[in-house]
UniProtKB/Swiss-Prot annotation:
The species this protein was found in: Bradyrhizobium diazoefficiens (strain JCM 10833 / BCRC 13528 / IAM 13628 / NBRC 14792 / USDA 110)
Protein name in the entry: Pyrroloquinoline-quinone synthase
Underlying gene: pqqC
Swiss-Prot/TrEMBL GO biological process terms: pyrroloquinoline quinone biosynthetic process; sulfur compound metabolic process
Superkingdom field: Bacteria
Signal peptide: none
Family: Belongs to the PqqC family.
EC number: 1.3.3.11
Keyword line: Oxidoreductase, PQQ biosynthesis
GO molecular function per UniProt: pyrroloquinoline-quinone synthase activity
InterPro entries: Haem_Oase-like_multi-hlx, PqqC, PqqC-like, Thiaminase-2/PQQC
């Protein structure tokens, strides 16, 4: 199998004509999906990392992204609830701690709030999620629903966007520090921490799907789960682009005071 054989992938699935007959072919297909559909390719991210947004637009991104970040441990709790296997639950549990933290230790959600606070947003307003775009809420809730309703294999597979996360974190850290005078290293701590957390999580999930997707149909479902997740990430940026770059902010959503 080569990249040319994967050109028939749609916005929903890899299609019925693609047969993945081994774990190696599965991994190759997953990496192709990431290389062609990960949200690092979205025009909004190009603007964000290239210093082309104003402060209000960066605030809007951080505010909306908070809803996704703060929902991740809820999603992971749902994933854990799908498994009778104790070893899998133990492995997955640290993901909740990574984001929620623990008594006396900071987690990813607190680090994200450092970012929004550093950008000048009121923390109570951010945590209320009252100002996020409707599309943000719909996409994130759809992700939780997916992990609850689909198979445990698909629930794990939907996390495989983490295979491609380190590169976007590196690009974001470098680009935002270089281009925005209102960004400093302290408020970028979330991304620095994920440089080590994401590869660990991705490696487990990749090995899990390689081992447990044993038929072409199961391998297709794994690929389709990753396609779904790339759509979840992509559509959130579509909404930000439409609202804050093209100027179509929906009623009641956050309106930046700075530009």
């Amino acid at each position: 199998m080569n990249a040319a054989s994967l050109t028939g992938i749609t916005a929903l699935s890899i299609g019925k004509d693609i047969k993945l007959n081994s774990a190696e072919e599965l991994e190759a297909a997953l990496r192709h999906i990431g290389a062609t559909r990960y949200h690092s390719l979205h025009p909004f991210h190009k603007l964000l990392h290239g210093g082309k947004l104003n402060k209000g637009q960066v605030q809007a991104w951080a505010l909306n992204r908070y809803y996704y970040q703060s929902t991740i441990p809820i999603k992971d709790a749902v994933v854990i609830s799908r498994f009778r296997d104790r070893a899998t639950r133990l492995e997955w549990r640290h993901r909740i701690e990574d984001h929620d933290g623990d008594v006396g230790s900071e987690g990813g959600i607190e680090r994200w709030l450092k970012l929004t606070e550093g950008l000048g947003l009121d923390t109570a307003y951010v945590e209320s999620t009252e100002g996020i775009l409707p599309a943000t809420r719909f996409a994130v809730e759809a992700y939780v629903h997916y992990c609850r309703e689909k198979s445990p294999l698909e629930a794990i597979a939907s996390s495989l966007t983490e295979l491609f996360a380190p590169s976007i974190h590196e690009e974001r850290i470098a680009g935002m520090l270089q281009h925005y005078d209102f960004v400093n290293p302290d408020i970028m701590s979330y991304f620095k921490r994920r440089l080590t957390q994401a590869p660990r999580d991705a490696n487990f999930a990749l090995e899990y799907v390689r081992t447990h997707a044993r038929t072409p149909e199961e391998r297709a479902s794994v690929c389709n789960a990753l396609i779904f997740k790339t759509n979840v990430l992509w559509v959130q940026l579509d909404a930000l682009q439409h609202a804050y770059v093209e100027g179509h902010i929906p009623p009641g959503a956050f309106v930046p005071k700075e530009n």
